[in-house]
Structure formats: structure tokens, C-alpha cells
Amino acid sequence: TKYDLYLKTEEEKKIQREKQIELTQEYNKEKNLALPKMLITSGFSFEGYRIVKYSGYISGDDAVQVNRGTAGFFSDPTNVGEKLMQSLTIIRRNALRELKEAAYDLGCNAVIGVDFDYLTLDPQTANSSGGTTYLPYVFGVTANGNAVIIEKIEDDEA
């Protein structure tokens, strides 16, 4: 009957979804084990390794918003520099993690030529509906590099 066919189709869809979830979990597990082992350098080679494949230019980004005082002399002072320094380490690490993930997604195990670019968006003040809106400072960081596959050079090859 049509209903039996419908039930069979739904059961097959459920099995496919479960398989996809299982594959995704396995992929994420492998990725989480591989990322900490990935080699990163600002240079263009690794001593004791040879580059066997260049996979292209990649980047990872992150940003943070830092609020500013909104009531002039009556507001609590916001030390933008202090808040930025607290956030900068975190957003640099996040950008570097994204960079590693991009390399992993290309099948690579290392990144060469890594550098960081920084972006600052000064806050704007907007007037709307009779009030003033104080927009936050925005600071961003981008980690750039070239994804590569490297192999360890064996002692007999050196």
C-alpha cells in the first residue's frame, strides 16, 4: 500500500540521517585530533620536513566589539585598550584555529607564511527616534597563510 511505501521511505531517510550524523561525528573527532598536531610557521619551510604539495592561500578571521561609554562624564569610563588586550589573545587564537580548519579541509597538515592582519573600525554615533545610539568599537584579526602537505625527511634521505 501507499502507506507502507511511505513508512519504508521514511525509515530509509532516518537511516541515512543517522549515517550522516555518524560520519560527521567521526570527521569532527579526526579533525579535533589533527588540528593540535598541525605545524604552523611564519617562514616558508620546516626543518626536517619537505613540502610535497601546495594547496593554496587560506585565511581565518575573528572580531570583537568593545562598548564605549554612552553618557559622557556621567558614564562609567570604558578602558578600550584594556578590553581590547583582554580580547586580542582570544580573537587571534580563534583566527588561527579557523586557519588550521581551512588547511585541514584542504587535506593539509601544515601552514607556511603565516601572518596576522588587524582591522579597527572606529565607533559611530547614530541619532534615531530622538535618541543617540553609541555604536561599539570593532576590532578584527585575520590570520593568513599557505596550506601545504609536508612529509618528514628520513635520516637516510638527508
Report the location of each language-model feature.
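C-terminal edge-of-domain segments
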Residues: S128-A158
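Short, well-ordered alpha-helical segments
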Residues: I58, A63-D122
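Intrinsically disordered, low-complexity, basic-enriched segments
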Residues: L5-K8, V80, I112, E151
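Histone-fold modules and their flanking histone-like tails across chromatin and transcription assemblies
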Residues: Q25-T78
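Basic, amphipathic N-terminal segments that precede the first structured/catalytic domain
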Residues: T1-L39
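Terminal helix-to-tail segments of small alpha-helical proteins
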Residues: K19, D105, F116, Y134, ...
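A structural boundary/capping signal
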Residues: E10, S45-E47, Y54, L106, ...
